[in-house]
C-alpha cells in the first residue's frame, strides 16, 4: 500500500462513523457538486454504527445520482467494466467495517480515496484482502445539478443569529446607553 497525491478528490471523514457520507461527498465533488458531510449524514440515516449501504443509496438518489448496490463472490469481477468512481465496502484491520471510493482500476493497482487516509494505491491482492465484494455504483441522473451546497462560516453563524434579532437589538442599545454613561 502506497500513499500518493493525484488529481482525484478525497473528502476526509470527520469521525469513525462518517466514512460512508465522506465517500458520497467525494463522488459528488468529483462530479461538480460540493455538499457537506453533515447533510449527507442526515439524509443517509447515519447513527453510532455508521451508515449502511441502503442509507448511502437513498442519500445518493437525493443528491441526484442513480445508485445501486451490487455484490460479487468473485474478486476478479473488479476488473469488469463498471462506472467509476464507485464506493467499495471493505473490512479494515479485520474488524472495522469501512467504505472507500474506487477511482481507478488496472491489473497492477487500484487507486482509492480512503476517507480515513487520503488517496491510496493498493495492489489487487492487497485490495482483495479487505474488500467484501460489495460495491455501490453511482452515475449522475438527468436531474443531477452541479453546484455548491456548503455554507461558509459567516453564513452559518449569521443563520443562527437571525432568530435572535430582537435580543441583539436590546443588547446593542443597552451597550450604547452604558457606553454613553447615561446611567450611573
Language-model features: locations:
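Membrane-integrated ABC transporters
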Residues: 1-184
Amino acid at each position: 500500500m502506497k500513499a500518493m497525491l493525484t488529481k482525484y478528490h478525497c473528502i476526509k471523514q470527520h469521525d469513525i462513523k462518517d466514512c460512508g457520507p465522506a465517500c458520497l461527498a467525494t463522488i459528488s465533488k468529483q462530479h461538480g457538486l460540493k455538499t457537506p458531510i453533515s447533510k449527507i449524514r442526515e439524509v443517509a440515516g447515519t447513527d453510532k454504527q455508521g451508515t449502511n449501504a441502503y442509507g448511502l443509496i437513498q442519500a445518493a438518489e437525493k443528491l441526484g445520482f442513480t445508485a445501486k448496490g451490487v455484490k460479487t463472490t468473485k474478486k476478479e469481477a473488479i476488473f469488469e467494466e463498471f462506472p467509476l468512481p464507485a464506493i467499495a465496502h471493505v473490512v479494515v484491520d479485520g474488524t472495522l467495517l469501512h467504505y472507500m471510493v474506487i477511482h481507478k482500476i488496472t491489473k497492477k493497482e487500484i487507486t482509492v480515496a480512503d476517507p480515513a487516509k487520503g488517496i491510496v494505491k493498493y495492489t489487487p491482492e492487497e485490495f482483495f484482502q479487505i474488500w467484501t465484494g460489495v460495491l455501490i455504483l453511482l452515475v449522475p441522473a438527468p436531474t443531477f445539478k452541479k453546484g455548491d451546497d456548503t455554507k461558509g462560516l459567516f453564513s452559518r453563524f449569521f443563520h443562527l443569529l437571525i432568530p435572535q434579532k430582537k435580543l441583539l437589538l436590546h443588547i446593542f442599545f443597552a451597550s450604547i446607553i452604558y457606553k454613553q454613561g447615561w446611567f450611573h
